[in-house]
A protein has these predicted regions:
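Short beta-to-alpha linker loops that shape the active-site pocket of alpha/beta-hydrolase fold enzymes
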Residues: 52-56, 111, 156
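Active-site nucleophile elbow and catalytic-triad environment of alpha/beta-hydrolase enzymes
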Residues: 110-117, 123, 132-136
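Catalytic active-site module of serine/aspartate enzymes centered on a nucleophile-bearing elbow/loop
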Residues: 148-149, 154-193
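N-terminal cap/lid segment of alpha/beta-hydrolase-fold proteins
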Residues: 1-13
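Conserved hydrolase catalytic core segment
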Residues: 78-113
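Conserved acidic catalytic loop of the alpha/beta-hydrolase fold
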Residues: 62-79
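Conserved loop-alpha-helix segment in the C-terminal half of the alpha/beta-hydrolase fold
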Residues: 40, 126-156
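Conserved HGGG/HGGXW glycine-rich cap/lid loop of the alpha/beta-hydrolase fold
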Residues: 15-57
Length: 193
Protein backbone atom coordinates (compact mmCIF):
# COMPACT_ATOMS: atom_id res chain seq x y z
CA UNK A 1 0.00 0.00 0.00
CA UNK A 2 1.32 3.45 -0.90
CA UNK A 3 2.10 5.77 1.97
CA UNK A 4 -0.68 8.30 2.57
CA UNK A 5 0.42 11.91 2.69
CA UNK A 6 -1.27 14.12 5.25
CA UNK A 7 -1.44 17.81 4.35
CA UNK A 8 -1.53 20.50 7.01
CA UNK A 9 -4.30 23.13 6.71
CA UNK A 10 -5.04 26.41 8.39
CA UNK A 11 -8.63 26.14 9.65
CA UNK A 12 -9.22 29.10 11.93
CA UNK A 13 -8.06 28.08 15.40
CA UNK A 14 -6.21 24.89 14.51
CA UNK A 15 -3.74 23.33 12.12
CA UNK A 16 -5.23 19.94 11.33
CA UNK A 17 -3.58 17.37 9.09
CA UNK A 18 -5.78 15.92 6.36
CA UNK A 19 -5.66 13.00 3.90
CA UNK A 20 -8.03 10.78 1.95
CA UNK A 21 -11.42 11.41 0.38
CA UNK A 22 -15.04 10.49 0.89
CA UNK A 23 -16.98 10.57 4.14
CA UNK A 24 -15.10 12.38 6.90
CA UNK A 25 -13.59 11.11 10.14
CA UNK A 26 -12.37 13.78 12.56
CA UNK A 27 -9.63 12.33 14.78
CA UNK A 28 -8.60 14.03 18.03
CA UNK A 29 -5.36 12.75 19.51
CA UNK A 30 -4.26 13.54 23.01
CA UNK A 31 -0.53 13.31 22.48
CA UNK A 32 0.17 16.32 20.28
CA UNK A 33 1.74 14.01 17.71
CA UNK A 34 1.58 13.61 13.96
CA UNK A 35 -0.79 11.26 12.11
CA UNK A 36 -0.02 7.58 12.67
CA UNK A 37 -0.15 4.44 10.55
CA UNK A 38 -3.71 3.85 11.85
CA UNK A 39 -4.72 7.26 10.47
CA UNK A 40 -3.12 6.40 7.12
CA UNK A 41 -5.13 3.19 6.97
CA UNK A 42 -8.34 5.09 7.75
CA UNK A 43 -7.48 7.61 5.02
CA UNK A 44 -7.25 4.82 2.46
CA UNK A 45 -11.07 4.61 2.62
CA UNK A 46 -12.27 7.92 4.10
CA UNK A 47 -11.32 11.57 4.42
CA UNK A 48 -9.43 11.88 7.72
CA UNK A 49 -8.76 15.16 9.54
CA UNK A 50 -6.41 14.81 12.53
CA UNK A 51 -6.28 17.37 15.35
CA UNK A 52 -3.48 16.86 17.89
CA UNK A 53 -4.19 18.31 21.33
CA UNK A 54 -1.37 19.85 23.32
CA UNK A 55 -1.09 21.07 26.91
CA UNK A 56 -1.80 24.61 25.66
CA UNK A 57 -5.24 23.71 24.30
CA UNK A 58 -7.08 24.36 27.58
CA UNK A 59 -9.91 22.12 28.74
CA UNK A 60 -11.32 19.33 26.61
CA UNK A 61 -14.55 21.30 26.26
CA UNK A 62 -12.69 24.39 24.99
CA UNK A 63 -10.65 22.26 22.59
CA UNK A 64 -13.84 20.65 21.25
CA UNK A 65 -15.34 24.09 20.61
CA UNK A 66 -12.24 25.18 18.67
CA UNK A 67 -12.10 21.91 16.73
CA UNK A 68 -15.80 22.20 15.84
CA UNK A 69 -15.17 25.70 14.46
CA UNK A 70 -12.13 24.49 12.51
CA UNK A 71 -14.09 21.57 11.01
CA UNK A 72 -16.87 23.97 9.98
CA UNK A 73 -14.25 26.30 8.42
CA UNK A 74 -13.10 23.36 6.29
CA UNK A 75 -16.68 23.03 4.98
CA UNK A 76 -17.42 19.71 6.69
CA UNK A 77 -21.05 19.36 7.75
CA UNK A 78 -21.37 15.70 8.74
CA UNK A 79 -18.65 13.43 10.12
CA UNK A 80 -17.73 10.59 12.44
CA UNK A 81 -15.32 11.31 15.28
CA UNK A 82 -12.50 9.34 16.87
CA UNK A 83 -10.84 10.33 20.14
CA UNK A 84 -7.54 8.79 21.16
CA UNK A 85 -6.12 8.83 24.70
CA UNK A 86 -6.64 12.25 26.26
CA UNK A 87 -8.42 13.29 23.04
CA UNK A 88 -11.41 11.13 24.03
CA UNK A 89 -12.94 13.81 26.25
CA UNK A 90 -12.68 16.45 23.51
CA UNK A 91 -14.26 13.99 21.06
CA UNK A 92 -17.19 13.46 23.41
CA UNK A 93 -17.65 17.20 23.99
CA UNK A 94 -17.68 17.63 20.21
CA UNK A 95 -20.29 14.85 19.93
CA UNK A 96 -22.38 16.58 22.60
CA UNK A 97 -22.46 19.91 20.74
CA UNK A 98 -25.94 20.70 19.48
CA UNK A 99 -24.62 22.08 16.18
CA UNK A 100 -22.51 19.01 15.41
CA UNK A 101 -23.90 16.53 12.89
CA UNK A 102 -21.92 13.49 13.98
CA UNK A 103 -22.64 9.90 13.02
CA UNK A 104 -20.73 7.76 15.52
CA UNK A 105 -17.88 8.02 18.01
CA UNK A 106 -14.89 5.70 18.47
CA UNK A 107 -12.75 6.15 21.59
CA UNK A 108 -9.39 4.39 21.28
CA UNK A 109 -7.77 3.79 24.68
CA UNK A 110 -9.60 6.72 26.29
CA UNK A 111 -7.65 8.35 29.08
CA UNK A 112 -8.83 9.90 32.31
CA UNK A 113 -12.17 10.06 34.05
CA UNK A 114 -15.13 10.81 31.77
CA UNK A 115 -17.41 13.74 32.58
CA UNK A 116 -20.82 12.69 33.93
CA UNK A 117 -22.44 14.84 31.21
CA UNK A 118 -21.33 12.26 28.64
CA UNK A 119 -23.94 9.90 30.10
CA UNK A 120 -26.60 12.05 28.40
CA UNK A 121 -25.18 11.63 24.90
CA UNK A 122 -27.47 9.45 22.79
CA UNK A 123 -24.94 8.80 20.05
CA UNK A 124 -23.61 5.35 19.22
CA UNK A 125 -20.08 4.91 20.61
CA UNK A 126 -17.37 2.26 20.59
CA UNK A 127 -14.64 2.07 23.23
CA UNK A 128 -11.46 0.20 22.24
CA UNK A 129 -9.08 -0.94 24.98
CA UNK A 130 -5.88 -2.91 24.70
CA UNK A 131 -5.52 -6.18 26.59
CA UNK A 132 -2.19 -4.92 27.98
CA UNK A 133 -3.68 -1.61 29.17
CA UNK A 134 -3.63 -1.85 32.97
CA UNK A 135 -5.80 1.23 33.53
CA UNK A 136 -9.52 1.02 34.21
CA UNK A 137 -10.24 4.00 31.96
CA UNK A 138 -11.89 1.96 29.19
CA UNK A 139 -14.26 0.38 31.69
CA UNK A 140 -15.17 3.77 33.18
CA UNK A 141 -16.04 5.17 29.76
CA UNK A 142 -17.94 2.04 28.71
CA UNK A 143 -20.02 2.08 31.87
CA UNK A 144 -20.98 5.76 31.56
CA UNK A 145 -21.94 5.95 27.88
CA UNK A 146 -25.56 4.81 27.30
CA UNK A 147 -25.19 3.43 23.74
CA UNK A 148 -21.68 2.05 24.04
CA UNK A 149 -20.01 -0.98 22.52
CA UNK A 150 -16.75 -2.25 23.99
CA UNK A 151 -14.02 -4.19 22.23
CA UNK A 152 -10.61 -5.44 23.34
CA UNK A 153 -7.66 -5.17 20.99
CA UNK A 154 -5.25 -7.98 21.75
CA UNK A 155 -1.57 -7.38 22.44
CA UNK A 156 -1.99 -3.61 22.79
CA UNK A 157 -1.47 -1.23 25.68
CA UNK A 158 -2.50 2.42 26.00
CA UNK A 159 -0.76 3.33 22.70
CA UNK A 160 -3.31 1.20 20.89
CA UNK A 161 -3.13 2.95 17.50
CA UNK A 162 0.67 2.79 17.38
CA UNK A 163 0.88 -0.81 18.60
CA UNK A 164 -1.96 -2.29 16.53
CA UNK A 165 -2.75 0.20 13.72
CA UNK A 166 -4.30 -2.37 11.37
CA UNK A 167 -6.65 -3.67 14.05
CA UNK A 168 -7.69 -0.19 15.19
CA UNK A 169 -8.34 1.02 11.64
CA UNK A 170 -10.25 -2.14 10.68
CA UNK A 171 -12.50 -2.04 13.76
CA UNK A 172 -13.10 1.73 13.55
CA UNK A 173 -14.05 1.58 9.87
CA UNK A 174 -16.41 -1.34 10.49
CA UNK A 175 -18.07 0.59 13.30
CA UNK A 176 -18.37 3.84 11.34
CA UNK A 177 -19.86 2.01 8.37
CA UNK A 178 -22.15 -0.41 10.21
CA UNK A 179 -22.67 1.19 13.63
CA UNK A 180 -24.79 -1.18 15.71
CA UNK A 181 -24.36 -4.04 13.24
CA UNK A 182 -20.56 -3.83 13.09
CA UNK A 183 -20.03 -6.89 15.31
CA UNK A 184 -21.33 -9.02 12.47
CA UNK A 185 -18.32 -8.26 10.31
CA UNK A 186 -18.37 -8.68 6.55
CA UNK A 187 -14.70 -9.60 6.63
CA UNK A 188 -12.67 -12.20 8.45
CA UNK A 189 -10.90 -10.58 11.40
CA UNK A 190 -8.56 -13.51 12.07
CA UNK A 191 -5.57 -11.49 10.87
CA UNK A 192 -6.15 -9.21 13.87
CA UNK A 193 -6.43 -11.71 16.74
Amino acid sequence: MAETMFAEHWAGEGFPCEAGSGETIVVITGDGGLPTRAHELLAARRRVIVFALTADDGTAREAARRIGAAVAALGVERFDVMGEGAGAAAAMWLAAAAEAEIGSVVLAAPDGVPDEAFGEIKRSALVLSGTKDQSAAGDRWRTLLPDCHFMLVYDAGPAIGAERPEAVAFIALEFFERRDLFLVSRENGVVFP
